[in-house]
């Protein structure tokens, strides 16, 4: 039986991971849960799964959780803070760590799991978008097995030879007969919206994703295709891919989650119902398979699968991300930080939908930054980029 620590247990990926555990109680047990400040959900999770440890982001939330668990007779030891999260990610008797804390808060706990040699199920985008080289070097040094949880990266992983799966980030695609990785994206809710209407698009319209159920921030990222841009950056690191070995295409049905082209003309693809439990179950049980609880794909109901090329004028954020990777880690870090500020401002109706790309581009252009050599340097770039982005948002809002 695998012992699990889940970093970010109350979020979308965390709750989906626990749903897979619920389907397979004879294969997985929860050793530790880590979350932010959602005490109510964490209490329910502790009552159901009885972890030995739980950690909250701060002492106030931890105190509330202790009271709730004591009232229910649950003996889980409750901790608080980033150091506690790092300790629970590196526990001796933990086999697998799900890294699903969103944002910079997930960097150090994820790195702690890698350095402890755990099998790491990676959902934290920032680990690779802002710290790709640092993280992949740590993976190689610790001989950790990294398993991607994003549906697209998991699809690519499943479509690659086992020899690459076992040496993620350091194998040569070319020497294994791989010619290109094809990253698919739905194109979001504005795929067919006339461009002249973009300035009038509202947060609610941007968050109405046609296929996936997601949080508001990532829904906006889907509408701008910044999410695909960030996934492109992650894929370059995860699969040691050059720009020439990457391809991004629109696939509105979200059934093919990504593909791999081989030199002999073959294309391997992973298909499935759009549900995060599928890639999570695959990674949790790898190299075996377990029940995820997901409904089987009905090909007759789908009818047809279509593809198109993403237009630059419709999806400028996608191309900003592609160009940022070639500019370096400082640029991808700055872009990610700027985008978080811009999307938050759009969701609060402080700027227009089209301003998101404008803010992102100006931040990357204005900052003159050195390549980061440690996480502190990454966090400083992140801070500077946010500062500039906030100033730009204010100038647009006034």
From Swiss-Prot:
Family matches, as InterPro entries: DXP_reductoisomerase, DXP_reductoisomerase_C, DXP_reductoisomerase_N, DXPR_C, DXPR_C_sf, NAD(P)-bd_dom_sf
UniProt pathway annotation: Isoprenoid biosynthesis; isopentenyl diphosphate biosynthesis via DXP pathway; isopentenyl diphosphate from 1-deoxy-D-xylulose 5-phosphate: step 1/6
UniProt EC number: 1.1.1.267
Superkingdom assignment: Bacteria
Organism: Serratia proteamaculans (strain 568)
Cofactor requirements of the protein: Mg(2+); Mn(2+)
Binding positions for NADPH per the UniProt entry: 10-13, 36-38, 124, 126, 215
Residues reported to bind Mn(2+): 150, 152, 231
Any Gene Ontology biological process: isopentenyl diphosphate biosynthetic process, methylerythritol 4-phosphate pathway involved in terpenoid biosynthetic process
Function recorded in the entry: Catalyzes the NADPH-dependent rearrangement and reduction of 1-deoxy-D-xylulose-5-phosphate (DXP) to 2-C-methyl-D-erythritol 4-phosphate (MEP).
The name this protein goes by in its record: 1-deoxy-D-xylulose 5-phosphate reductoisomerase
Entry binding sites for 1-deoxy-D-xylulose 5-phosphate: 125, 151-152, 186, 209, 222, 227-228, 231
Top class in the EC scheme: oxidoreductase
Quaternary state and interactors: Homodimer.
Family: Belongs to the DXR family.
Single GO MF annotation: NADPH binding
Reactions that this protein is recorded to catalyse: 2-C-methyl-D-erythritol 4-phosphate + NADP(+) = 1-deoxy-D-xylulose 5-phosphate + NADPH + H(+)
